[in-house]
């Protein structure tokens, strides 16, 4: 039996976790990060790689539909915060890439969305 209330609770936790980066009380989500800052942030994000002005990670799922459920949850979160990844769907794998096309590189918003993506990836049952 599928427990919708548990999924709903987990989704609420994930969606309400807007990671914001501030400096002197000022929102810095759309400021480009230095290579050093990006690499420092990625220490906490297991499996994420920084290369060619993007951060990316490939996730594996037990079933194709688990991966699609993850994509749907990620798409909703991206719409909510207006920061959208490039997503590549494979058989039981999903690759997620963040960059700011406007700024030409990785911003704090990219890192914040990578953190949110990590949380969403643990809700691996499709709905």
Predicted regions and their residues:
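N-terminal first-folded block
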Residues: 30-64
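Short arginine-rich
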Residues: 47-50, 75-85, 121-124
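Short amphipathic alpha-helices in soluble, non-transmembrane regions
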Residues: 70-74, 111-114
């Amino acid at each position: 039996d599928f427990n919708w209330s548990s999924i709903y609770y987990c989704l609420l936790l994930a969606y309400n976790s807007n990671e914001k980066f501030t400096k002197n009380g000022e929102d810095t989500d759309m400021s480009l990060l230095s290579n050093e800052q990006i690499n420092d942030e990625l220490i906490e994000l297991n499996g994420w790689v920084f290369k060619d002005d993007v951060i990316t990670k490939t996730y594996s799922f037990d079933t194709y539909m688990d991966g699609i459920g993850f994509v749907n949850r990620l798409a909703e979160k991206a719409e909510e915060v207006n920061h959208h990844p490039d997503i590549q769907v494979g058989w039981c794998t999903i690759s997620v890439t963040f960059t700011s096309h406007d700024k030409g590189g990785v911003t704090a918003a990219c890192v914040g969305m990578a953190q949110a993506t990590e949380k969403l990836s643990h809700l691996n049952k499709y709905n």
